[in-house]
Amino acid sequence: MDKKIILAIESSCDETAAAVVVNGREVLSNIISSQIDIHTKFGGVVPEVASRKHIEAINAVVEEALEVAGVTFDDIDAIAVTYGPGLVGALLVGLQYAKGLAYSLDKPLIGVNHIEGHISANFIDHKDLEPPFVCLVVSGGHTFVVHVEDYGKFEIIGETRDDAAGEAFDKVARAVGLGYPGGPKIDKLAKEGNSDAIKFPKANFHDDTLDFSFSGVKSAVLNYLNKMEMKNEEINKADVVASFQKAVVEVLTDNAIKTCKMRKADKIAIAGGVASNSALRENLLREGEKRGIKVLFPSPILCTDNAAMIGSAAYFELLKGNVSEMSLNAKPNLRLGER
């Protein structure tokens, strides 16, 4: 297939994003308008506020993406957009905008699964990466360990049965008074603490899955904090978050390594916002090196929600002839591998 230039749009949560991507791996622009400062005062994302801010920002974000890329609508071969999972109101803003563009410009519309987008972020930073490989997807809303069999073809080996890892980070951060967003704040404070100070539980299911559970360790942290407060004992917040982080990171690492062994894979790619966590990166690199497993991370800008990853995933769908109808609707509970 000749060079394909895709304009991608992402609005699944609290970032309004647009990007221009060539052949799935070359990013000409990647513009993100974040609402994090707005939602911080609420202690988390407020869906209605997020939707309104997307409406206000989306036109300017798309125009900037085209300008930075040095292209016009005439140069675009397809319009890609996230249609799930995510906040339904937020998804609809991006989806309706993309539909309008695709219809008015007579361009193909490609709906992209947000989680698949996170996985595809690795194709941008690692130009020679090709399936098969193992991918650990860790974000505020999702935690999966996946065997990527081919472009757009996934086998879910393990997933969370309750809280996502990033969600647990946010809840623990709130409990110790760090506020939102929890992940980066815990990562920073944990560097000052002793990760062996408190033994928090790690969930290990005695079945044939490599599923995750983070509600137990989250509850253990909350119980520890309550007990310390009842005793009027001083709480070392750095030790608490370092010990919590260690429990989460070790489970994520263990299951990713086990998946490599099960599927005889020699590469692990990391995806999602928690992929920026320094302890997770260090632990995976260390354990991977011991076993001859190459560990790959996207750059921090590609770990967060962005449209470049959506443009990358869309390209590989376009190669297979998978384009969407104008009747495409938002699917807030869309699962990995579903259409």
Swiss-Prot record:
Name the gene for this chain: tsaD
- Is Membrane among this UniProt entry's keywords? no
Q: What does this protein do?
A: Required for the formation of a threonylcarbamoyl group on adenosine at position 37 (t(6)A37) in tRNAs that read codons beginning with adenine. Is involved in the transfer of the threonylcarbamoyl moiety of threonylcarbamoyl-AMP (TC-AMP) to the N6 group of A37, together with TsaE and TsaB. TsaD likely plays a direct catalytic role in this reaction.
Q: Where in the cell is it found?
A: Cytoplasm
Q: Where does substrate bind?
A: V137, V138, S139, G140, G141, D170, G183, D187, N277
Q: Where is the signal peptide?
A: none
Kindly state a single biological-process term from the GO annotations of this entry.
Answer: tRNA threonylcarbamoyladenosine modification
Q: Name one GO cellular component term.
A: cytoplasm
Give, as one word, the top-level EC class: transferase
GO MF, one term, reads: N(6)-L-threonylcarbamoyladenine synthase activity
Major location, coarse class? cytoplasm
EC numbers for this chain: 2.3.1.234
Q: What is this protein called?
A: tRNA N6-adenosine threonylcarbamoyltransferase
Q: Which family does it belong to?
A: Belongs to the KAE1 / TsaD family.
